[in-house]
UniProtKB/Swiss-Prot annotation:
Belongs to the FPG family. This is Formamidopyrimidine-DNA glycosylase. It catalyses: Hydrolysis of DNA containing ring-opened 7-methylguanine residues, releasing 2,6-diamino-4-hydroxy-5-(N-methyl)formamidopyrimidine; 2'-deoxyribonucleotide-(2'-deoxyribose 5'-phosphate)-2'-deoxyribonucleotide-DNA = a 3'-end 2'-deoxyribonucleotide-(2,3-dehydro-2,3-deoxyribose 5'-phosphate)-DNA + a 5'-end 5'-phospho-2'-deoxyribonucleoside-DNA + H(+). GO terms for biological process: base-excision repair. Its cofactor is Zn(2+). Monomer. It holds the Pfam family H2TH. DNA binds at residues 92, 111, 154. Involved in base excision repair of DNA damaged by oxidation or by mutagenic agents. Acts as a DNA glycosylase that recognizes and removes damaged bases. Has a preference for oxidized purines, such as 7,8-dihydro-8-oxoguanine (8-oxoG). Has AP (apurinic/apyrimidinic) lyase activity and introduces nicks in the DNA strand. Cleaves the DNA backbone by beta-delta elimination to generate a single-strand break at the site of the removed base with both 3'- and 5'-phosphates. Its EC number is 3.2.2.23, 4.2.99.18. It comes from the Bacteria. Disulfide bonds: none annotated. A zinc finger (FPG-type) spans 239-273. It comes from Lactobacillus acidophilus (strain ATCC 700396 / NCK56 / N2 / NCFM).
Length: 276
């Protein structure tokens, strides 16, 4: 699943491709992708101009004229690509926005898990899935003290807590494994048993890792591509994710893999301390 750095990279690469274009028509090849009323989606969008793209956590917010916004969640394998109206349709293209210049933005999704909805701009924090999200890394709301205080209330393993988007928004399996390894914290550690000093280090590692991953244009380990069809670069910097059975570069012990609430989790059993 694209995590926050990947979605931010999609936003940055998609914006110059479509900003200023006017929608002429919309085609729904697989209507289920649109979670709101299909007829309204098809009726309201023609004539609307793309004025910008924002992002919150893993959600793209495509801003339109007349105070409308398309909220788009890529889920597991959603992608956008710009083509022309007459270009052959890929079997996994499910939604098409045809512009007045006859270019077309297509949403492609092998798994068909992604969703879009049309809302009034400014109401995105009322959208199911967004309204309960916690703060993003590298924001004033995600302070060191916030994370320390939040973890004190959680008697769950730290991996689950960090994947819970109500604690911190935008993290997924890759960056949680990486930041826990950087912080020398075992993924099965109970959140409220981790010393405050270690939580402070975790907070710093989360912020630094997400910032660097955005700088490197995200991580491609499966199918992620940006809006230009290019892979990310952070996969070359992964220290633990995807390295099960290899030596830990810090201590030389062998990385192991376990399941934590159904999620594959790679860690070093020697230098990642378990707090219980």
């Amino acid at each position: 699943m694209p995590e926050m750095p990947e979605v931010e990279t999609v936003r940055r690469t998609l914006l110059p491709l479509i900003k200023g274009k006017t929608i002429e028509k919309v085609v729904l090849w697989y209507p289920t992708i649109v979670a709101t009323d299909h007829d309204e989606f098809l009726k309201e969008l023609p004539g609307k101009k793309i004025i910008g793209i924002d992002r919150y956590a893993k959600y793209l917010l495509i801003r339109l004229s007349d105070n409308l916004t398309i909220v788009s969640h890529l889920r597991m394998e959603g992608k956008y690509h710009l083509t022309t109206e007459d270009a052959p349709k890929d079997k996994h293209d499910h939604v098409e926005f045809v512009f007045t210049d006859k270019t077309a933005l297509r949403y492609n999704d092998v798994r068909k898990f992604g969703r879009m909805q049309l809302i009034i701009t400014g109401t995105e924090r009322q959208v199911t899935g967004i309204k309960k999200l916690g703060p993003e890394p590298n924001t004033s709301e995600f302070s060191q003290q916030y994370l320390i205080d939040n973890l004190k209330k959680k008697h769950k393993n730290i991996k689950n807590v960090l994947l819970d988007q109500t604690t911190v928004a935008g993290l997924g399996n890759i960056y949680v494994d990486e930041t826990l390894w950087q912080s020398k914290i075992h993924p099965l550690s109970i959140a409220n048993k981790i010393p405050a000093k270690k939580v402070a280090g975790l907070w710093e590692n989360i912020n630094q890792t997400i910032a660097l991953a955005i700088e490197k244009r995200g991580t491609t380990v499966h199918s992620y591509l940006d809006a230009n069809g290019e892979v990310g670069g952070y996969q070359e910097m992964l220290q633990v994710y995807g390295h099960v059975g290899e030596e830990c570069p810090r201590c030389g012990n062998i990385f192991e893999k376990i399941k934590v609430s159904g999620r594959g989790t790679t860690f070093c059993p020697h230098c990642q301390v378990i707090y219980k």
